[in-house]
């Protein structure tokens, strides 16, 4: 089996449907004896350029290990799902399990936020 990194962008009006979509794609991979090495929900982000007059979209990234047939099935599902605006599949040399730079950036923001929140109450008191 081969390793792939898949990123797909979901229409912002369909953000509530993202967990169900992820479960369906996970089911496709795991149902064919594949593995999911990393699954990250990057949330709603600004697009680099408008797609169908939309400026923000919901991003999801998956690192999977699966066969060619499973990958074709997932890409076929992306093409016929109107909520998926764009998708990109990259073949990887190995399984990637460490956090992506996007998640490291979010974690850094989260680590900074509690410190600033903790500083505000003491200043107000």
Swiss-Prot record:
Keywords assigned: Ribonucleoprotein, Ribosomal protein, RNA-binding, rRNA-binding
InterPro entries: Ribosomal_bS6, Ribosomal_bS6_sf, Ribosomal_S6_plastid/chlpt, Transl_elong_EF1B/ribsomal_bS6
Any one cellular-component term (Gene Ontology): cytosolic small ribosomal subunit
Region (Disordered): 101-125
Disulfide bonds: none
Gene Ontology MF term list: small ribosomal subunit rRNA binding; structural constituent of ribosome
SUPFAM superfamilies recorded: Ribosomal protein S6
GO biological process, one term: translation
Domain of life where this protein originates: Bacteria
Function according to Swiss-Prot or TrEMBL: Binds together with bS18 to 16S ribosomal RNA.
HAMAP family associated with the record: Ribosomal_bS6
Family to which the UniProt record says this protein belongs: Belongs to the bacterial ribosomal protein bS6 family.
This protein's name: Small ribosomal subunit protein bS6
């Amino acid at each position: 089996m081969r390793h792939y990194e898949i990123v797909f962008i979901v229409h912002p009006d369909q953000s509530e449907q993202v967990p169900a979509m992820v479960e369906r794609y996970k089911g496709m991979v795991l149902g064919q004896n594949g593995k999911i090495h990393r699954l990250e929900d990057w949330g709603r982000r600004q697009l680099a350029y408008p797609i169908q007059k939309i400026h923000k979209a919901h991003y999801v990234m998956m690192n999977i290990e699966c066969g060619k047939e499973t990958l074709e099935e997932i890409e076929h599902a992306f093409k016929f799902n109107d909520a998926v605006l764009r998708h990109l599949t990259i073949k990887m040399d190995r399984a990637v399990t460490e956090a992506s730079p996007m998640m490291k950036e979010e974690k850094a923001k989260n680590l900074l936020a509690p410190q600033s929140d903790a500083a505000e109450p003491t200043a107000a008191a």
